[in-house]
Amino acid sequence: MADRSGDVPVISWRMSREARTTGKLGIDMDILQWMKGHHVFFDGGMGSLLQEKGLGAGELPETWNLLHPQVLVDIHKAYLRAGANIITTNTFGANALKYPSGGQWELEALVRAAVENGKRARKEYAWEERARGACAGEDDIPVFVALDLGPTGKLLKPLGDLDFERAVELYKEVICAGVQAGADLILIETMSDSMEVKAAVLAAKESCGLPVFATMAFDEKGKLLTGGNVESIVALLEGLRVDALGLNCGLGPVQMRSIAQKLLEVSSTQVIVNPNAGLPRSEGGKTVYDIDADRFAQEMETIARMGISMLGGCCGTTPVHIEKLVERCRDLPVERPERKHRTVISSYSQAVVLGKDPVIIGERINPTGKSKFKQALRDHDLEYILRQGVTQQDNGAHVLDVNVGLPEIDEPSMMEEVIRELQSVIDLPLQIDTASPRAMERALRCYNGKALVNSVNGKAEVMEAVFPLVAKYGGVVVGLCLDEDGIPETAEGRIQVAKKIIETAARFKIGPEDIILDGLCMTVSSDSKGALTTLETLRRVRDELHGKTILGVSNISFGLPQREIINAAFFTMALHDGLNAAIIDPNSEAMMRAYYSFRALSDLDARCGDYIGVYGNRQGLSLGATLSGKSGDLGGSKANGPGGTELAGGAGGGMSLSEGVIKGLKEAAQEAVKEALKTGLPLTIINEELIPALDVVGKGFEKGTVFLPQLLMSAEAAKSAFEVIKAHMDCSGQAQEPKGKVILATVKGDIHDIGKNIVKVLLENYGYQVIDLGKDVPPEKVVEAAVKDHVLVVGLSALMTTTVPSMEETIRQLRKEASWVKVMVGGAVLTKEYADTIGADRYCRDAMASVEFAGEVLGG
């Protein structure tokens, strides 16, 4: 068989009427060309079919690539006969964490065998088609072998213990083996962590030139485990320039419909929808799904008619499901996605669109003119920097500028560290503000989302340094309207520089929607016409270039007394003349008054709702009160006054214990608890401050207003406070016994322990002793641990369909040998109904539900 890495088939004999009547289109067409004018049909589930062929509970599916290759070839051919264009290799769980070097199985051999099985299936299928006269040979059928990459099973730092670069390496190992074996494209699927999918995409882009598709595992609310939503993920993946994006697994086609619609609304890239066959349940020890092939195809036709032409299946779907899907959808019109021309940046959890409604960029994380901030950088006082970010978020910023440029520090290292730490406690998008290309790349590589990049200008050497970074990592880049000749004195001169920036960016395939132009705000004290020139530039960018604009507003008043008066007036004028994003101090009462007033007067604030929300109650609401839905705060105080002065004191800064925990600030929580212990009783502090603060964050997590990074950082802050209290109680002879013991384990055959580890952190913070048995745990080991310590609660986790039988067997053995145990279960493949059928006492859809169940059984 010829090497297929660059020679891909082009003609479908069954995909569309056009293909059936026009004949061969040429053998040089690849998947990207094919999908422009044709439906693309993926295959369906693999694990459930392997189980039918004898894959045992806890057995590793990827080993069948070598042990039973004919089984894999037959499954692939069944999907091809059903009409699939893309067959995915049996490599979903293949990585060096699961198959370490020196182990029983060689990772490269498993991956190569998987690709070769797919290629063999394609070749044999082509022979069948040629025998019946449907094609001339293998090069006449549009069949592509996709190298399948699933999650590593680990949370990336700072949420977990897997380093980002290590994740990239793990994926590169698999990709290199798959590419050498002849894969046609890379399919990254079932991703629940935006940072992990970024690692996988970068690994693919840095290892090969194959097309890259990426699909995410959203819940019914359109959220990822780590907090991402549809808009933030689209921003990230389109910034990374994937060739198609979408969703798979976890949900059936009915539940996916609304998420698919949202994808269509915001994506300029082809959308993929690969649902499960409905929701799972257990029958006779086997996993079955509640939607049959006919119903599945009917629902998928509805999705196809929305404008989606890349369709397939995931868990529970079979060749019959795919055949019915192809029959109903192959002759539908193929719709290309419209280019949305949206200027959008994102964090891990939210997207900010720059357009009609002005955006506030907080300017306080910057050492310029701030002696305390400079000292914090020298002292490596990250908590001080985090406090600056938290305060700006509380006071209304939509984006935070991050500048750590100081000659005496290592700016690239500090920038990377500050970006990571800020994103662990704040969910706002960030603006990476640096003149150093090294610092810029370090920041862009570790950034979780699509960043605002500050900046590029019209100088050729600067554009050549910055644009390749934006093209590789994604981002919206600030274009300063200056060049080798300096800052033009006229608006016309600045517009000419802006045009040069836009034209040069196009060479790097960076569209005008990913450029935001800075008309340059000069101090009015030295140039009385400077403000008017800037305002004219704003209007011309808006009206002539149809572009987006940004300004560092406070530059206008440099050298003048009562600067806020000038700043606020100019800010309002600039907003009127088309300013889309303003770099200001959101802690400034005058600036925020100007902002909310302008929006209310410009029909940007429906019924003045935001204005009333801010100024109707002059005391406002703290973050904790907002999360809990109560007025008043939790005892904290504003860190900055109305003038936007620097934080007084160190990291603690007078913040209450509750506020420190809620905001995820460890040092602040430690300082607050030390102060509280001077006058309060340890148990009173725990029960009246620490636990209620955790409850506030937990309720926010359940409501979807707090996301996993914030939840875990709050847990870490609470843990640091608990350690101070424990040390105090140990010294005074008041040591407290844990509330009870809980066993946690990821079941045999499953290496994905993300959910288990999150549950562990929360249970420990609520005072329970956790016995963590790890991952890939045999049922006998769970039973042994439960009997040994007479543990009352056992928590079991499984991500993969193929490992749910292991969970059921573990529960069966617990019922036999440790009947007193209450079992809670969780994982992406489970539902309440499924948990009931395998004998669990409680299905826990998230970590907080596990805490609640432990409280019911053990008290507390």
Model-derived segments and spans:
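Domain-level signal for soluble alpha/beta catalytic cores
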Residues: 3, 9-518, 522-860
